[in-house]
Amino acid sequence: MEFVVQLLNKAGGSINDMSMDYRGGDIDLSPDKPRGLPFLKPLYGLPPYQYTDDVVLMIVYESEETAIREALPSELEPMPGNIVTMCFFLCPDVTGMGARDFTMPCIPARYGDYVGQFVPYLYTSTDASLACYREVQGWPAVLGQTETTEAQGRVRARVVRNGREIIHATATVSGETITSLDFLPVILYKEIPAFDGQSCDDAYFVTTTSLLTNLNFKAGSGELTFPDADDDPVARLKPIKIIQALYGTLDDLYPETIRILKNLK
């Protein structure tokens, strides 16, 4: 930046008094119309996003209250039961972002009287989804690969990050088909740090809902471990009791609704 200022000063101008009496580039920018970056080929499209034929494994379990509170901001209170749902998604067809896979723990919590589920960590497999999750939606995403296989009702899933298997799950499902699920609204914290590192350009809690269709699930039992998590904080959410496993497919329009819960600015 100092070098740029020196060049401007040598040319007889400064950053503060530069006028706009020149043609400029061909790209028009406006805060009312996001362009996406990089300009000529944005990494991802703008929402909403249609997910089609998602393959999903959910392990519902009870965890330690202390571990759950470690993962929650002070504005949120965990719901009774100390429930966590670990969700493994394979997404072969997603508008705007392309095929990918991701895994996230969802913690039922309330903001005042509003009940939703907070997502403290998320592992996604592509650079496009990583950037979109963090920049647009506020999901706390890092890179990680989700693998899921199923044969005759036996399901296996795992998450690999930096060559380490940090999450491993198995499930056995059978019985009647489940065509509807009570999926709580998601609560996210979106933060954009300021360039000086001393404050935030934006910081707020937002809640979103999904339009889930074409659900086809079966229920059963499961197991969940963190084999080689090292210092990854997701491993703090260890299960003390498995409640249920769900496995199946769905379509998802996201987001269906958006609402700001609290602006911290």
Model-assigned labels for residue ranges:
Residues 65, 73, 126-128, 229-240:
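Short, structured coil/loop segments at alpha-helix boundaries
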Residues 91-172:
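Aromatic- and glycine-enriched beta-alpha-beta binding-site module
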Residues 2-22, 27-40, 135-265:
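Interaction-surface and assembly-scaffold signal
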Residues 42-87:
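N-terminal ordered "arm"
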Residues 32-33, 42-46, 51-53, 90-93, ...:
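Short secondary-structure boundary micro-motifs
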